[in-house]
């Protein structure tokens, strides 16, 4: 029996042949960037031209919806969307890449002490790993599965933080993140490459993610999608983030979990054991 919460889609069918497992990073394994919307939304509020009928609540809601709908894609897409909002309101938007760099500068300030604490060994990586992450990674490795990391966060940061959290070794050279030349990377490209290179079908693919993009990409190729509706601010609470849960079920997630406290059991269910 599951000790924690789990939601399994009606009509779920086990996949005994899974060989390749793709993880999103932030919110799925890493909590180093927890709270990033509290950096992005205020920045957008500050830079957005006013329009008639605006209330601070309506603007915030609009921006949050834009941001969360694109969660899982490279950060640049949230900036492109914001630039469109600025233009719609008669403003002259900056280049989205400028917005991205300014956002990353602000976010770096917010997470600076977390990164420094990890670098100096003052903080246990467990504090910034979603509850049960290592149990899950070890359980997958012991089954001989090939693991990949594909993140919408810039690749340099993904590599830095995966290393600091002690999870880089599970993925080896298969750590992929956003590039300034954003057309050269997407989660879908990573998935397509895995299937093509290994000559396998989506039947053999398992994806863990907390953004709608990777769940949708996974279902589009016939993979099994585990949505991680993690409550990032309360790691280990075992509670769902309801917004994520509803959103990810809406794009076809097969299983929804809040964290990995039931890692071994979860994999047995997935494999039909």
Region annotations inferred by a language model:
Residues 142-145, 198-203, 270:
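Glycine-rich phosphate-binding loop signature in dinucleotide/nucleotide-binding domains
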Residues 65-126, 131-142:
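A metal-dependent, Asp-based hydrolase signature
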Residues 40, 122-128, 133-163, 175-182:
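Substrate-recognition element of Asp-dependent hydrolases with the DxDx(T/V) motif
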Residues 151, 207-258:
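Acidic, Mg2+-coordinating phosphoryl-transfer loop and its flanking beta/alpha structural elements
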Residues 4-61:
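Active-site neighborhood of HAD-like aspartate-dependent phosphohydrolases
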Residues 134-142, 195-196, 215-226:
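Surface-exposed amphipathic alpha-helices with a cationic face
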Residues 185-218:
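Conserved Lys-Pro-Asp/Glu-containing loop-to-beta segment of HAD-superfamily phosphomonoesterases
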Residues 97-98, 168-184:
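A short, structured active-site edge motif that brings together acidic residues
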